[in-house]
């Protein structure tokens, strides 16, 4: 699995690059993790309802092809796009989602933060507050899009939406629990290591 650090990049070109990568991949294409941050942007999923955008401001809204409702990305949030051929790995999308959740939970545990997945709601939570979001697109036996983990960011734009379609959803981030707060790059090093641990055995065990 190749890990590519792209830094702070605009959302729309990254979205187009994901679609191009997925459309052009073949049986020999190596899976990739893209580690990024984005300037402020709201992204609206395939089944997204306009009423979940509560306040219109100068933050752009981009309609995209992942599942789920509206969410927010901004500087200080770690985003990892998971370009994974799940058919080749002989696994399921549910297992990929679990691997993402488990990797986030293990990463947060390294900072002393007790987090958990919720079987009724996508994402990872600290108590009732959401710290990470997940969203995937399934196409041609592969997935793309991925996860967003709040590290040290301005959370106020989340109050302009119903995050992932849930009214009143309270958001949190690593900076609320850890000071000095690690940088997104420091968190990315731990998170990608956990992702490799989650995914590599699955490939090896099914060869």
Swiss-Prot record:
Q: Which residues form the BPL/LPL catalytic domain?
A: 27-203
**What main location does UniProt list?**
cytoplasm
The UniProt entry's sequence similarity note says: Belongs to the LipB family.
Show the NCBIfam families listed in the entry.
lipB, PRK14342.1
- Give the top-level enzyme category: transferase
Q: Which domain of life is it from?
A: Bacteria
Q: What are the binding positions for substrate in this chain?
A: 66-73, 133-135, 146-148
Biological process GO terms, please? protein modification process
Which Enzyme Commission number(s) are listed? 2.3.1.181
Recorded hits in Pfam families, A to Z, give:
LplA-B_cat
Which source organism? Neisseria meningitidis serogroup A / serotype 4A (strain DSM 15465 / Z2491)
Full protein name: Octanoyltransferase
Question: Known InterPro entries for this protein?
Answer: aa-tRNA-synth_II/BPL/LPL, BPL_LPL_catalytic, Octanoyltransferase, Octanoyltransferase_CS
Instruction: State where the protein is found.
Output: Cytoplasm
GO MF annotation list: lipoyl(octanoyl) transferase activity
Catalytic residue list: 164 (acyl-thioester intermediate)
User: Gene encoding this polypeptide?
Assistant: lipB
Keywords, in A-Z order: Acyltransferase, Cytoplasm, Transferase
Q: Which reaction does it catalyse?
A: octanoyl-[ACP] + L-lysyl-[protein] = N(6)-octanoyl-L-lysyl-[protein] + holo-[ACP] + H(+)
């Amino acid at each position: 699995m190749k890990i590519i650090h792209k830094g702070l990049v605009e959302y729309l070109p990254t979205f187009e690059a994901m679609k191009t990568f997925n459309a052009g991949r073949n049986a020999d294409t190596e899976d990739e993790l893209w580690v990024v941050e984005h300037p402020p942007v709201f992204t609206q999923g395939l089944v997204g309802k306009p009423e979940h955008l509560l306040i219109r401001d100068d933050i752009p809204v981009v309609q995209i092809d992942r599942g789920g409702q509206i969410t927010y990305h901004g500087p200080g949030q770690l985003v990892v796009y998971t370009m994974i051929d799940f058919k080749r790995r002989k696994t399921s999308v549910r297992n990929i989602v679990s691997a993402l959740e488990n990797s986030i939970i293990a990463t947060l545990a390294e900072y002393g933060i007790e987090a958990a997945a919720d079987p009724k709601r996508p994402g990872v939570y600290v108590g009732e507050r959401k710290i990470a979001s997940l969203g995937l697109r399934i196409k041609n036996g592969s997935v793309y899009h991925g996860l967003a983990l709040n590290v040290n960011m301005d959370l106020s734009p989340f109050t302009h939406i119903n995050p992932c379609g849930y009214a009143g959803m309270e958001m949190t981030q690593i900076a609320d629990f850890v000071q000095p707060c690690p940088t997104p790059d420091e968190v990315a090093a731990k998170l990608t290591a956990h992702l490799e641990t989650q995914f590599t055995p699955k490939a090896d065990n099914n060869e």
